[in-house]
From Swiss-Prot:
UniProt similarity note: Belongs to the PIGU family.
Gene Ontology MF terms: GPI anchor binding; GPI-anchor transamidase activity
Coiled-coil region: none
Residues bound to a cardiolipin: K216, K309
Gene this chain is encoded by: Pigu
Pathway: Glycolipid biosynthesis; glycosylphosphatidylinositol-anchor biosynthesis
Top-rank taxon, per record: Eukaryota
Membrane-spanning residues: 4-22, 79-99, 137-158, 159-178, 179-194, 195-205, 223-244, 287-306, 312-331, 332-345, 355-372, 385-406
Quaternary context: Heteropentamer. Part of the GPI-anchor transamidase complex, consisting of PIGK, PIGT, PIGS, PIGU and GAA1.
Entry binding sites for a 2-acyl-6-[6-phosphoethanolamine-alpha-D-mannosyl-(1->2)-6-phosphoethanolamine-alpha-D-mannosyl-(1->6)-2-phosphoethanolamine-alpha-D-mannosyl-(1->4)-alpha-D-glucosaminyl]-1-(1-radyl,2-acyl-sn-glycero-3-phospho)-1D-myo-inositol: N383, N385
Descriptive protein name: GPI-anchor transamidase component PIGU
Membrane topology category: Multi-pass membrane protein
Amino acid sequence: MAAPLALVLVVAVTVRAALFRSSLAEFISERVEVVSPLSSWKRVVEGLALLDLGVSPYSGAVFHETPLIIYLFHFLIDYAELVFMITDALTAIALYFAIQDFNKVVFKKQKLLLELDQYAPDVAELIRTPMEMRYIPLKVALFYLLNPYTILSCVAKSTCAINNTLIAFFILTTIKGSVFLSAIFLALATYQSLYPITLFAPGLLYLLQRQYIPVKVKSKAFWIFSWEYAMMYTGSLVVIVCLSFFLLSSWDFIPAVYGFILSVPDLTPNIGLFWYFFAEMFEHFSLFFVCVFQINVFFYTVPLAIKLKEHPIFFMFIQIAIISIFKSYPTVGDVALYMAFFPVWSHLYRFLRNIFVLTCIIIVCSLLFPVLWHLWIYAGSANSNFFYAITLTFNVGQILLISDYFYAFLRREYYLTHGLYLTAKDGTEAMLVLK
C-alpha cells in the first residue's frame, strides 16, 4: 500500500504547487470560506512584521494565532508554501496509519464477537471482510488530500491546516495506545484552537478500552487511569502555555487568542453561524447569546460519551464534525477533516436515508458561496441575508448529514444483535425508529 499512498501524495503536492504558482492563489487567500480572522495568513504576516519591529504581535486587534505559530513562521516564512504542503501530507499519513490500525482492532473485535455468538444469525451480510476494509486507509488519505476544501485551505495558507495535523496525530497516537503522546497532541490541538478539548472524552474512552479497563463509576482502575491521563493532558497544556509566556514575556496571547475565540468580537462573515446573529443583535444581549452559541460545541459531549462509550472512534468523528459546525470561526478546512472519515463508515451507506440530497445541498452551497458574496459585496444586488441564508443551509446540511450517519451507525449496531429482519408481536415486519 506504500506505492498507492506515495502516488496520492505526489498528485496532491503537484496540484498544490501548481495552484501556488497560479493567479488563483491570491484570490483563494481572500475567500471568507477558506480563511477566518483566526487562520488568515495575512494576519500572520502582520503579526510577524510587528514581532520584527520589537512590538508584541498582540498589541493590535489583528493577530490572533498562538505564539508557537508565529515563532514557527518567524524562521520558516520563506518556506511557508512548503510548510503547508508538508502539513497536509503529514495529516494524510497520520490518518492513513491511524485507520489502518483501527481496522485491525475492528476486525479482531468482530471475530471475537462472532466466536462468542454475540451476533444474530441472519446478519452475515453486515459482517465486514478484510478485502472490504483493505483500501479504506488509502481512501481516507485520498479523501483528505484531494478534497477541494483541503486544497483551497492549503493554497490560502490557512493555519487551520496545522490544527488538522495536530488532531490527526492525536487520533494516531490514541489508536496506537500511546497515552503520553496522545495527551501531548491533544494539549497542542487545544492550545491551538481550544475546541479540541472536547476530544478528551473519546480519547480517554478509547485508551480505557485498549487497556481493558471497564468504564464503570465504581471501578478503581477507571478512576486511576482517567486521573493519570487528565494529569498528562493538563500538565502538557500548562507546559505549552508557559513556554508561550517565556517566548513573549507576556500573557497578552491568552485574551488575544482564547478570549477572541470565546467572545467572538470580529464579525467578519464566514461559513459559521455566529457572525450574522451578533451583527444584528443589541449589544446588551450579546453575552447571553455568546454563551448559548458556544455551549453547542460542549453540550453534546456528555450524552454522546454515554451513548457511544463502546465506540469511541465514531464518537471522535461525530465530535470533530460538531466542532467544525459550531465553532466561532469555522472554515472549509475544518469541514475537510471530518469528511476524510467518510470511507471509514462506508459500511453504513446502506442505512443512510438522505445521503444523495444532503450531498447535493453541500455541493450546491459550496458553489453558491462565492456567487452570493459577489452579489452582496461587489454587485450590490444582494445583502447579507442572502449570504447568511446559504451559510445556514450549508450548516443545516452538515447537521443532517452527521445525524444521518449517527442514525445509520446505531441502526446497524441494533441489527447486529437483534437480527436484520425484525418482526412485530403480530408477526408483521417491524420498522426501526430512532427516538
